[in-house]
Each structure stands twice: as structure tokens, then as C-alpha cells.
């Protein structure tokens, strides 16, 4: 993940990844590389919190992160200061091992004063994903196991067609692992700017041909739990 192309949101990893081969939608989509650990927090000052982490990378170094970043919820927040810190790893093994190396609830007084931990969770990418954080639309979706592989296939198709149509977009589908009652499938549509995200929406409302693929994909979704825009960035890269 040095040149990270993850190809970076509940129970055991084996039980959650296996549905991709089930159902009557033949052919498994190759899962993406690596894994992510996300720490969901409520920050009194998100910008100050992010700067503090940039200036003090020791926690990232301690857990062996390959890359780390922050996402701040910009629209549809559940609470003021909603954001999360993510850490990218080369494998699920490394991601799981990181949980033994750092306890976010035992942080320094300086960190504890600026943010309140909500929960943490691991994610496995279910398709290739180019990690280029910026303007990100995040949907939390409930999708039955029998439809998950078909949904991922549609996202692979949609991403390809949208890029052919001139959009600089990365689409990711992520399986939560160990997220308790909080998490569902994460669908991310990432653009280099909010203006580009808006251009995609203009084309969608204008009847772009690729909207038929989107319609087929959303027909496989049981429930849209939430829909937000986030501003994401890389704040640490291992040397």
C-alpha cells in the first residue's frame, strides 16, 4: 500500500466476506487489497484535532499504519463535529494487530480534551479502490448477502462507464468488520473537488446514460441508512 491502490463504512471476517460467492449472481468480484481501521469521534474543533495529529504522528507509527487520514462530515451530520480518523494497512492481519497496539480511550490529555471517541471499526474493500481522498459522498447501505456481489459488480461497471464519460471518480464498496450495531456497507464516490461532485449530480439529474446502471444497483439495496458528504485527506504516510 506504499503506492496504495486498494483493489481507502457485523461479525467475523470469514462470515462477512463469504456472501460474495453466494446467490445466483455468478462470478466473484476480487476483493480490494489491504484493510482500514476507522476511529469515529466527535471533535470540538475538527481542524485543530487534525492539525494536532499531523504534528504528532506517534500513534500512527505505533500501530504500523501505512497511511492514515481524516474525514470530516460536511452535510447531514448526526452530531456537531462528526468525523473519523482512518488507518490503512497492507492486510487484515495488520489491521487486527493494530487494535492491540493503541487504545484510543487511553489517549493523551491533549487529545482527550479535543475529541470524544464514539466507536472504532475495521473495513475491507470489496473492489479495487484508488485512494485519492477529497470530496466524498458516503452512503451507508443495508444489502442482503445474496445481493452483495451483484451490487459490487454494478459499482465496478458504473465506475468504468463514468470515467469513460469524463468524470474523475473513484467508487469504493467497503465491508464493516467488528462495527457492532453501528455499521453497514459503505459506498463511497470520491471526486477531486466538490465542484466535480456537483458536476456528477448535474449529469445524473440530466439523464446520463450511466444512471441506468445506478438504478439497477440501487434496486439491490434494502435500505439507505444515511447519505453524507465528507471532506477527506491524507494526514500521515509511513516513510
Which residues fall in each region the model found?
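Positively charged n-region of N-terminal signal peptides that target proteins for export
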Residues: 1-4
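Bacterial N-terminal signal peptides
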Residues: 7-17
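Short S/T/G/P-rich N-terminal loop/turn motif that feeds into the first structured element of a domain
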Residues: 20-239
Amino acid at each position: 500500500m506504499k503506492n496504495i491502490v486498494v483493489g481507502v463504512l457485523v461479525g467475523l471476517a470469514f462470515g462477512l466476506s463469504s456472501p460474495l460467492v453466494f446467490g445466483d449472481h455468478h462470478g466473484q468480484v476480487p476483493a480490494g487489497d489491504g484493510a482500514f481501521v476507522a476511529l469515529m469521534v466527535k471533535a470540538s474543533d475538527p481542524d485543530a484535532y487534525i492539525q494536532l495529529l499531523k504534528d504528532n504522528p506517534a500513534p500512527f507509527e505505533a500501530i504500523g499504519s501505512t497511511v492514515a487520514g481524516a474525514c470530516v462530515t460536511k452535510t447531514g451530520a448526526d452530531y456537531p463535529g462528526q468525523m473519523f480518523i482512518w488507518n490503512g494497512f497492507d492486510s487484515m492481519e495488520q489491521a487486527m494487530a493494530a487494535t492491540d497496539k493503541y487504545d484510543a480511550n487511553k489517549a493523551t490529555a491533549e487529545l482527550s480534551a479535543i475529541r470524544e471517541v464514539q466507536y472504532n471499526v475495521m473495513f475491507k474493500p470489496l473492489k479495487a479502490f484508488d485512494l485519492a481522498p477529497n470530496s466524498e459522498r458516503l452512503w451507508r447501505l443495508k444489502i442482503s448477502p445474496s445481493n452483495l456481489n451483484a451490487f459490487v459488480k454494478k459499482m465496478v461497471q458504473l465506475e468504468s462507464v463514468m470515467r469513460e464519460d469524463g468524470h474523475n471518480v473513484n467508487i469504493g464498496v467497503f465491508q464493516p468488520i467488528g462495527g457492532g450495531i453501528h455499521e453497514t456497507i459503505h459506498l463511497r464516490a470520491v471526486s477531486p473537488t466538490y465542484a466535480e461532485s456537483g458536476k456528477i449530480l448535474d449529469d445524473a439529474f440530466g439523464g446520463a446514460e450511466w444512471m441506468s446502471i445506478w438504478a439497477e444497483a440501487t434496486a439491490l439495496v434494502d435500505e439507505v441508512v444515511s447519505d453524507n458528504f465528507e471532506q477527506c485527506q491524507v494526514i500521515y504516510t509511513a516513510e
